Amino acid sequence: ESEASGHTFIQVTEDGENGILYYPGTNGRVTVESMLLALDACEKDDIVMLQNELPDTAGLIEAALERGLRTVLNPSPFDASLLKAPLERLYALIVNETEARGFLADEAEGVEAAGLMALLERRYPDVNLILTLGSRGACGRVPGAEPFFVPAVKMKAVDTTGAGDTFAGYAVAALAAGEDLRTAMNRAAKASAISVTREGAATSIPRRSEVEALAV
């Protein structure tokens, strides 16, 4: 009660791009016991999405998988401790270009963005993959199928803060509702496009009705 929860400090440039400084605060002191209780409240085959803002995310991934949960990782922010997790057993991995390079390390040196998906496919053949590329769009891959591209929905950016979180949240919600990966990504692209037209993070996330009303 005497300490602050997590804070994110964001600087926005004139063209809407951002730089982010994250302070975990009490988020970094959540106990393993409380996290496991949350997982125990889920039912088998439920989808659980993890980022990397809690202690021992790698251990939490393993615990979720042991409980039969479809586990999605959106490693924001990335750090090397995540490589200890059984990532090859994830249901889905959602990464931007920087995060993808973190997972691939030396393999990605000198590789253009277009080649990152092929490297991710080779490393995680049984995982649904999403590689977001900002204003360029996103690549997706379902295990056993060819990768595909979902173009970004073009909108005038005011503030890109929260666009990645909006994309990931809408994509995972669509998957949980039974939609296929391509459909989920198209919905997420529309949602994130709306979000960049507004200032702020959580306040910029559109309602579902707004996303459904957006004609592209």
Model-identified regions with their sequence ranges:
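Conserved phosphate-binding/catalytic region of the ribokinase-like
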Residues: 80, 85, 106, 110-216
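Ribokinase/PfkB-type carbohydrate-kinase core domain
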Residues: 10-148, 210
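A glycine-rich helix N-cap at a beta->alpha junction
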Residues: 1-2
